[in-house]
Regions:
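Feature captures hydrophobic
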Residues: 1-109
Length: 109
């Protein structure tokens, strides 16, 4: 099986989305991924619905910055988000409360 890429993760993001956890939410999350598997994506969450787009959003509520490989590992459950943050592998700008909700909004896998 081929290695999972950042593009694969964002393509599958709607399948991992927990609409019930986001039913009252209105937020944009920007993902700035660096390194070999780099890319910029944003997730628009509104009223329990998710839309994922490539590129940057002008007014995200929260921005996550990390290496593409680390983001893949985080999404697959191979890297703990809190540990990644403490080790400086994950940088968060904006709404830290939203960052804490990421595990309930998206299932690993």
């Amino acid at each position: 099986m081929a290695d999972v890429t950042v593009k694969d993760i964002f393509k599958e993001m709607p399948n991992r989305f927990n609409a019930d956890a986001a039913k009252d939410m209105d937020a944009v999350i920007q993902f700035n991924l660096t390194g070999d598997d780099a890319g910029q994506y944003h997730a628009i969450i509104k009223g329990g619905k998710l839309e994922v787009k490539e590129g940057t959003h002008p007014t995200p509520k929260m921005t996550m910055t990390m290496a593409g490989k680390d983001y893949v590992d985080l999404t697959l459950g191979k890297l703990n988000g809190q540990m990644a943050f403490m080790q400086g592998k994950l940088k968060i700008a904006g709404d830290m409360g939203l960052a804490m909700k990421m595990q309930t909004l998206f299932r690993n896998g």
